Structure formats: C-alpha cells, structure tokens
C-alpha cells in the first residue's frame, strides 16, 4: 500500500508551538476516520455479539479478529481518531510519532501484523550513523560535555549491568520466562515477591558506590526514561522483566526499544487494521466516551456520555487503568481490582518533538537532572534541510506544564545542544482525559499482588489493555497480545463457526 491512499485529516489532539504563532491545538493524522460514525440503519438497538470499547491497538486487533470470524461487532471510541496512546501526526510532509513508536523483531505479534499488511520492510531508523552532530552530550549540572557514542554507551552499559544484576545472572534466574514472570515452573513466587518489594531507588542505593558520578547520572536518567515515573516509586521488578524481554543484554536496548520505526508512521498500521475490520463488517462510532457498563441477565449495556446505549453479549473493554475510575461498573469491580485502580500507575512522561535547522541527525544526549532527560536526532524532516528531534522526560508534574509554558520545552532542548528551533510538537498525555498518563509502569509491591486481577474478566466484560499484558506491558506488542486473547475468549463463548461440523453432526459410515 502507498501512503497516498490515506488522507491526513485534522484531529483535535496534539499541539504545536512556534514563537510566531504561539500554541496551536490540533494535528493532522491518518488516524482520523470519516465518517465518524457507521452503524447500519435499524441495527443501533440490536444486541451485538460483541462491543469493543477503545480503538487503540488492543481494540483494533480484537475488533478485527471478531469480525473476521463473523461476529457482529461494534467499536466505540471516545476520541476522533484510532490509535489510542499510539498515533502519528503528519506535519509539512514529516511524520511525528506522538506516542508509542518503535518496533522490533522481538515483538512477534506486532511484526506479524506488519507482515500481514505489507509493512515488514517499510521501516526507518531513528539513529543516522555519520549524521550531523554525531556525538553524545552529557550535562549533569556542571556544564555540557561531548562524548563519543561508544563512550556514553559503555558507561550506560556498565551502570545498567550493575543495577540489573540482582541475581548474579543478569535476571536469568529470577525471570527466566518473562511472559510468565509471576508464576512459572522455575522460580519460587516468594523470590519474585522479594524483588517486587524493591523500588528502583532501593536498588540504586544498593549499588551506587560501584558507579562513577557520570554512570550514576546516566542510570538515574535512563530509569525514568524507560518507565516514565520517579525512581523513588518505580518497581524494580518491572526493570528485571524489561531486561529479560530484551534478551538479558543491554547491548540490544537500542535495537529493541529505540531504533526501528514504521516509515509511514504507526497510524498507517493502525489504519490498515481498522480498514481491514471495516471491510469485514465492523461498525463503529467515534467521539463516544463511555460512562457506564452494566452486565445483567447475560447482556452487557454500554452507555455513552451522550446517553446512547448499546447492548452486546460480550464487551471487550480496552480502557487503560488510569481511566477505569471514570466508568461506573454494575456490578461493581472486585475490591482487589478497585484497590489496584486506586494505587494506579506511575508513567507521567513528557515526550516532545522539534524541527530544528540543519543536520543534527547524529545527536544523542542526556541531561540529569533536567526537564527533559534524553534527546535523539531522528532523521531529516521533509526537504532534507532540517532535523526531527525527539526528547523524553519522566514525571514532570508540578515542574513543567508544556501547555501552559511551551517555551520551557525549547529551553530544555537547548541544554542538549545549541539549536535553531522552528517548531515544537507534542501530545500532552497527562492532561489527555482518555489517557491521563503514558503506558503503565507500576510501583513496588504491585505486580505480584494485582496483575492477575487486572487481567481477569469482570463477568461478561473482558479487560484487555497493554497496561496489564503478560509480556510487553505498556508496549504495542502488549496491546496486541491483550486484544487477541480477549477476542479468542469471546469467540469461544459466543460461538466460532469453523470448517468442521459441530459434535454429533458426523454421519457414521456403514463400513469401517
């Protein structure tokens, strides 16, 4: 498929800041669907086989799999676009990933979707070897220094390996099966609970005497870069899981986490899944926030804030943990799940992009402490005369509000390297009412107590979100895992018509 088959329509989401125009709301994306509602006449009040709430990757995969099996399915989405916390904006010919971004062959479900829709080779890379400003800047508060990428990489690797080596085997003993972290045949659950008691700060305090000042600064910044929260609260067990998922090697961190992107943007893949589902019969309604879910007498009623009610035999709810308190469930959620939701998650990240003049494609950098922690030169913008810059921070609540003080993003970016900034772009996930945060990272003592409950069903409502995936929690891969599993469950219960006759329909042969 060519990107020209899609038109980038305006979304109400996303922000652009320039000194000339100030703050402007709304960005164009392939993820905006027109018309915004498609429900066949006379079918609005019927009982659907399934309703899928949320059009992120979990919801898209679930909806596609359900309609592909012939199930009458309605997709209900609060936003004006598909993608949830993963979407790409098209600005002046350049694609900007506003949320989830990178892909890897380690992400099996995601890669299979890329293969399915002809995108397996349609990738670009964030890092440009030999690009302009081909070095790493490190600013730990006493001025910026230039390091080679190898020097910075070696320091980061040494710090990470000391930090993560809790079991003396780089995580292999405590997490041999990262998709079954909390219960498998090789690890005593009590040992896992012991690790889950640790915050990342606890672990840093245990090993910081083994690190140089620069190594400590790099570790203090990469931890919130990974999890989006404060090291004082972030659970260390999640870091062990991340280590296992990247094959127990810091050497693969870039390849798995921050290197390969879909050339056309994540919204191009999301759009392919959505279009496939619509071709197969999916019906949908956008700008339809849900306010209540009622499960009674085998039928689930979903009511929107506009007082529209839709009914189905099963519901796949893909809302993130941060948004579950906004929904009234009847019957109420279990006390244990409510307890987990009250504690909630920690990823209050800031992610922004900038278009800067000249060639900064080779730039990498870290500032600690800083309003932004990491920066990546991210290829040329359209036209080849300016560079796309991507930057991340952890929990900046109370310190940096990019909507109220967007000029502070420019100031923070200048700490990495002198830049002539043409524009800054971002999605403010913390103020987004349908996200309220980034992809989940949990505090200590959370996963071993609450993960299984978050994954469990609530009557005829299946809960499916990357926030409680078994493997790649918080990743696109985890969202696809959850959506596919939920769809399979619905099909097994609502009925999946296969190629073989139902039991009892075989005719016995007169001769054997």
At which residue positions do the language-model features occur?
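Active-site/ligand-binding neighborhood in enzyme catalytic cores
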Residues: 180-289, 318, 328
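Core beta-strand elements of the Rossmann-like FAD/NAD(P) dinucleotide-binding domain
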Residues: 46-48, 305-314
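Flavin (primarily FAD) binding-site architecture
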Residues: 315-336
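Mobile amphipathic helical/loop "lid" adjacent to a hydrophobic cofactor/ligand pocket
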Residues: 2-5, 11-18, 125-234
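Conserved flavin/dinucleotide-binding core of flavoenzymes
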Residues: 2-36, 299, 365-512
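N-terminal Rossmann-like FAD-binding beta1-loop-alpha1 element of flavoenzymes
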Residues: 45-75
